[in-house]
Amino acid sequence: MIIVISPAKSQNFEPIKTAYQFTQPIFKQQIIKLINTLKHYEVEEIEKLMKISPKLAEEVFAKHNSFNPNKYDNSNAKAAIFTFSGDVYKGLEADTLDNKTIEYAQNHLLMLSGLYGLVRPLDLIQAYRLEMGTNIKIDGKILHKYWQDKITTQLNEYFSQQQNKILINLASNEYSQAIDKKSLAVKWLDIDFKENKAGAYKTIGIHAKKARGLMTRYILENRIENVSDIKKFNVAGYQFNPDFSDENLLCFTR
């Protein structure tokens, strides 16, 4: 069983003291191609491309131009699971997971990324900003199409070493479209979270993101390897709701 989640635009590069064996990014050649493309963009072009403020565009420009795709170590990079710090990662709270759970996560959790493609928890990453939905073409393909074959092939390789061949999709649509479901040789299971608002159940972005992190943590901490145990998730008031679920989707409501 492998979980996939989205990355986060917010990143924390404060040093941490750990004794983990860090790993290098999977798709180094593709990263070089992408970062070299991004380095050609001036501040004004970044502002327009990424639909961000001039100040933020300057920060992104600086990040990309200081990016060294041939060097990943503690001087310029940090393990991905401790770096991403958006809503999903607030639910995950990776810095409070024990060592054995982090090591388990290394083989059961993957983060999708516009720049890195697939990221394992202990892969070292440098500061960047490139959402999967960014309107940029690489080798004549939009970003998620550029990554699709590479990511799907790598996932199939990882699953060849897994006993339970189920992909738990806790990523957003923007990122999960970078996986070719038709070419994935395993079962795909979506998970959704809904809130009861005045008698109607709705998916609310900020709550759903944090819940994805909570679910990721639940699966990792409990070493869950089957769907029936995922249904037992009852964190933060969420419970499995069969009325909104089917064989390809588990929905949790509160």
From Swiss-Prot:
Signal peptide: none annotated. GO terms for biological process: response to hydroperoxide. GO terms for cellular component: cytosol. It comes from the Bacteria. Transmembrane segments: none annotated. Pfam families: H2O2_YaaD (PF03883). Belongs to the UPF0246 family. This is UPF0246 protein FTL_1717. It comes from Francisella tularensis subsp. holarctica (strain LVS).
